[in-house]
């Protein structure tokens, strides 16, 4: 009998994917410039220091830390189970990650950290937090992001980690794709290039073991219907179109229905994405597969609490 996996998209820059009879959650959470307060001379983090323009001090740091703890614990409280894998972006260093997993409400999750410093100018990285009691880590590696036409371009790495869940092989990637600086069309070639690179990694993994289930996540700075995902990653947008070895972008239908993870003007976008392999989408190998969220026609749902609403500033509402 196939076990089920359901995905919940939280529209607070995270996605939850659940496996097993009591679902496991896999989350992506954009931490939005989570810097420590210490000036690192090796990176451009002056803005987020007590002397910088944001006056980033210990009180502000601890407030953000508490908010992140509250969000992640609120997610765990849905079914009284901590997420098994949490991918994050825009975090400065391992010390910040250690502070997150040590918060009183998250410490019982006994999280381990997968993190490497990347060459990004401001020093922000991607990382994974994972529960070793469920995800059995076998390896991890930061892959340098390559833009062929810009050999000196430095950005966040593609962090990969692999292991097993219930004895089934899993391969995770988390990435923060190049921004839309200069405009979507002008910058699109960079995101397409990273999409192709991640597709190449996925193809190599599946060639070595077609039973491996792949989960890609991150801030892609593009919607699931954009070229970087449909052409760069080559992801399909409909479950019925999937064949062995394909990739599936499950949140295109939610975007078309008017949902999103961020709003610009009068339109919603889903820049925070997951893309998964066909065998995880359809359960064509093993016992783990996705399922629709309870009471939803989508592979997702909305997690929104009053304390997540920004009440002032440019992004209030």
Residue ranges and their predicted role:
Residues 204-214, 222-317:
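Metal-dependent phosphoester-hydrolase catalytic domains
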Residues 115, 159-254:
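Extracytoplasmic, non-cytosolic globular domains
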Residues 1-23:
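Bacterial Sec-dependent N-terminal signal peptides
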Residues 25-28, 84-89, 112-115, 126-130, ...:
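Structural recognition of the beta-strand scaffold that forms the well-ordered cores
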Residues 50-59, 82-88, 115-116, 147-149, ...:
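Second-shell loop/turn segments in exported
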Residues 19-104, 108-110, 114-126, 301, ...:
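N-terminal, active-site-proximal structural segment of metallo-dependent hydrolase catalytic domains
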Residues 91-171, 175-177:
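Structured beta-strand-rich core segments of catalytic domains in phosphoester-bond hydrolases
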């Amino acid at each position: 009998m196939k076990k089920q996996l359901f995905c919940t998209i939280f529209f607070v820059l995270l996605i939850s994917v659940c496996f097993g009879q009591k679902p496991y959650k896999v989350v992506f959470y954009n931490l939005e410039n989570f810097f420590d307060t210490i000036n690192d001379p090796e990176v451009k983090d002056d803005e987020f220091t007590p002397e910088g323009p944001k006056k980033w001090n210990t009180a502000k740091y601890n407030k953000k830390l508490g908010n992140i703890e509250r969000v992640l614990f609120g997610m765990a409280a849905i079914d009284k189970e901590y997420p098994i894998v949490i991918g994050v972006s825009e975090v400065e260093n391992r010390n910040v990650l250690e502070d997150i997993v040590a918060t009183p409400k998250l410490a019982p999750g006994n999280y381990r950290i997968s993190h490497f410093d990347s060459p990004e100018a401001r020093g922000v990285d991607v990382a994974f937090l994972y529960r070793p009691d469920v995800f059995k880590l076998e390896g991890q590696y930061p892959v340098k992001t390559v833009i062929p036409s810009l050999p000196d371009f430095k950005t966040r790495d593609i962090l990969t980690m692999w292991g097993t869940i219930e004895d089934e092989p899993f391969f995770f990637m988390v990435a923060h794709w190049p921004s839309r600086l200069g405009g979507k069309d002008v910058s699109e070639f960079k995101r397409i290039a990273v999409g192709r690179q991640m597709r190449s990694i996925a193809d190599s993994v599946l060639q070595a073991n077609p039973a491996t289930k792949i989960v890609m996540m991150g801030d892609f700075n593009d919607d699931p219907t954009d070229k970087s995902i449909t052409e760069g990653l080559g992801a399909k947008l409909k479950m019925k179109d999937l064949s062995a070895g394909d990739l599936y972008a499950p949140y295109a239908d939610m975007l078309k229905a008017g949902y999103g993870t961020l709003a610009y003007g009068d339109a919603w976008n889903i820049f925070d994405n997951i893309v998964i392999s066909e065998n995880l989408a359809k359960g064509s190998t093993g016992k783990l597969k996705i399922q629709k969220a309870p009471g939803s026609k989508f592979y997702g749902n909305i997690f929104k609490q009053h304390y997540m609403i920004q009440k002032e500033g440019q992004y209030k509402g």
